[in-house]
Amino acid sequence: PWHLQFSRGGWETNMATFFITLGVYLFIRGKNNYQILIWSIISFLISMYTYQSPRLIIPILIICLLIFYKNNLLEIIKKIETKKKIILGLLFLILSLPLILQFTSGEGSARFEGLSIFSDTGPSSRVNELRGEHNNLNSFKDKIIHNKVTAYGFSFLSHYLDHFRPDFLFIRGDPLIRNKVPETGQFYLIEALFLVVGLLSLIKNRFEHIKLLIIWILIAPLASSMTYQTPHALRALNMVVPLTLLMGYGIINLWFMVYGLWRKIVIGLVVVIFLFEFVHYME
């Protein structure tokens, strides 16, 4: 139910998540058709104009898409006339220019600086504290071990991993009351089974778009992880799409893993547990 409470509140991140998903879908559909690819890029740009998080996620996602489907894209580029290439390049530059200007301006970075972990002086103070415990404050070894890069790096890593904690995903949800339903995770607990089955099946069956799905899941919480408040269900909302796809893949494979009476038993148990969790969520 991760996206349900946010979709009722009119948050901008809902629209951003929609256009990210649409952009990925159109990119895959248009990997052999540049006209569809144009709409994919437009969708990605709209998502970046809609909310802050995609401004970090989308460039990384596009780079990954270009790498994964480079052979298809090279074939398309060869077929496009030089005049059209110039027009498309100028169009992309014009549409991207406001984003670039905002990102490089002080006004555009002000919000990020206010929420960023890098504006927190805690890790920096901790570095000085740890260095003070040694005899030589400026020794090379201590500078390598205790410095701002490692301090903020570990802080970022900790915040990043927060978004994959089982208690966040399936048990308690977001620590912020306004971003959660009490006593409920971001997903139903039964969906943890589908997630595990989906992940194992994805690795075993070598699904065609396995790289894209895994990368999407991994980069989805990057922007949220750079803020001091994690895990954050709102800023990491785009995680819901690849995780839901993975769970759906798990449901399909679970169906084919059991047969006969066992299939009926498993379906019955899943339905009962799901209904119980749904009623609990609605309460």
Region locations from a protein language model:
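Transmembrane alpha-helical segments
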Residues: 100, 269-283
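Membrane-integral, polyisoprenol-dependent glycosyltransferases
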Residues: 1-146, 150, 155-255
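Intrinsic disorder
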Residues: 254-263
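Surface-exposed recognition patches
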Residues: 246, 266-270
